[in-house]
Amino acid sequence: MAYQNFNMDHQWLPFTPNRSFAKDPRIFVAADGMHFTTHDGKQVLDAISSLWCVGAGHNRKPINEAIKKQLDTLDYATAFQASNDKAFRAAEMIAAMAPGDLNKVLFCNSGSEAADTSMKVALAYHRARGEGHRNVFIGREKGYHGVGFGGMSVGGIQIGRASCRERVLVQV
């Protein structure tokens, strides 16, 4: 289905009934502060900070400038057998704020990756302690933990969970 100046047939939206969406789409074309602007000029409050990814708001000038400055210096560096100075500084700052002896930081690219990685870390931790039998996860009804297999397996949103839960994590 063509919509405005683009074709909506090629993007698959997670946790979204895509055919229904195509009939009455919500298309955002801009964002500033706490609001989106739709293709037809309406303002929409982003009450969930775009799934908690923009807690400081959209299009914040100081954040935009810091990102641009960093992009001009180093856009990305893998954490596989290498790292970068900013990652070490950020890890140190986060560790200083964490309670007790929680002083290790593993950076992930998204909440979905963080959910899946935390599950792998929990399984590895118990296995290393000789308690590999501790492999049951508890999820919340209607809980959202991302679009990765682990997050969907422990999540409670039925539209996504049904397709992978029994194949990936049986004991949820």
How would you label these PLM feature ranges?
Residues 14-15, 19, 47-61:
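Glycine-rich phosphate/pyrophosphate-binding beta-alpha loops
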Residues 27-37, 53-69, 80-92:
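A structural motif shared across PLP-dependent enzymes of the aminotransferase-like
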Residues 1-35, 82, 87:
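Active-site-adjacent loop/helix segments that line or gate small-molecule/cofactor pockets in enzymes
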Residues 2-8, 72-106:
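Cysteine/selenocysteine-centered motifs that mediate thiol-based redox chemistry or coordinate metal-sulfur cofactors
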Residues 32, 47-48, 140:
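A secondary-structure boundary/capping signal
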Residues 92-167:
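PLP-dependent aspartate aminotransferase-fold enzymes
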Residues 169-172:
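Cysteine-centered metal-binding/redox modules
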